[in-house]
């Protein structure tokens, strides 16, 4: 089937092409174009016609001599003398004042001018005052309040309660407290004991008991002086200020 279709298409295309080519040839044969004479043929005929023309004798043109016309000489005219303008004297200041005297203004006009000038000056002053009033006044700067900082104690713990003496000598050895009412010279004696050791030490114990408070007072004063001298000046001032505010 494919071969048949291909053959039919080939034959149809050949028939169409032959018909188109034949039609173009037939149209050209019927409508022939007239050819124009070529340029070479025209030029050849023109040249041949020029050669065939008889030559005629031509007389030469007469020579015309050029005659120069003498122009009449122009009479020299003497130049006119230049007229210099005479210098005019400049007018003096006195002459100008005489010619143009100053016109004195009447008194009424002078009064009006003075009055007008005063009013202008007053208006200017009023405007300046109004402008100054309208300007926002600068608020006075508030001085910063001095807040006194509370100075915290550097020491913490049980040593704060002990006072300055404990600060001066932190690791001081404490002596034994005097116990009053020891019976028979024994620390934990009984009232029924009959030993004589307690009676022999009663005078010594009473003397030591009276000397100990005085010794403690003297020691405390010495330690207080030492602590005051070793205390820094700046902390002392801060402490005084703090106590004064409190």
Curated annotation (Swiss-Prot):
Domain of life: Bacteria
Record's keyword terms, sorted: Cell inner membrane, Cell membrane, Membrane, Protein transport, Signal-anchor, Transmembrane, Transmembrane helix, Transport
Subcellular location: Cell inner membrane
GO cellular component labels: plasma membrane
Bias kind Basic residues: ranges: 112-125, 142-151
Biological process, per Gene Ontology: protein transport
Periplasmic topological domain: 29-246
Identification of the protein by name: Protein TonB
